[in-house]
Swiss-Prot record:
Residues involved in substrate binding: 63-65, 76, 80-82
Residues spanning the signal sequence: none
HAMAP family, per database record: dUTPase_bact
Annotated function: This enzyme is involved in nucleotide metabolism: it produces dUMP, the immediate precursor of thymidine nucleotides and it decreases the intracellular concentration of dUTP so that uracil cannot be incorporated into DNA.
Pfam families, per the entry: dUTPase (PF00692)
Top-level taxonomic group: Bacteria
Name of this chain's protein: Deoxyuridine 5'-triphosphate nucleotidohydrolase
Gene, per the UniProt record: dut
Swiss-Prot/TrEMBL catalytic activity: dUTP + H2O = dUMP + diphosphate + H(+)
Keywords, alphabetical: Hydrolase, Magnesium, Metal-binding, Nucleotide metabolism
Annotated family: Belongs to the dUTPase family.
GO biological process: dUMP biosynthetic process; dUTP catabolic process
Amino acid sequence: MTIVCELESGADLPEYATEGASGADLRAHIEEPIAVLPGQRVLIPTGIKMQIPQGYEVQVRPRSGLALKHGIMVVNSPGTIDADYRGEVCIILANFGESTFIIEPKMRIAQAVVAPVVQAKFIVVDQEEGLTATSRGSRGFGHTGEK
């Protein structure tokens, strides 16, 4: 599969770090370092616009090392880049850590994962007819316990 990209001057294409990687690294396209205070959210540009084939999306996900070591997360994970979007890909990062984190120019800040999309047809049933019954029913939010 090919994703056509338009790059701002000095921006980098997404790049897979290893042969078996499912996520391609996205880099910060910034001129100066940006300090992210604990609890703060920032919007970081990548300098990339993508032409994603119809029937696919690009999911923006956190980098595990940034999350574990520094508490840096992609807030709306996974973020979705739709096939019909043509604007710059920007990453919403949040610092859930205890110290200020510095985003450096060209730093790998997130991963892009290409995934197929299925658009469903949504229909309505009246409440008398209802949904089909399951053993789970409407139980959620930890109903199976912690162990």
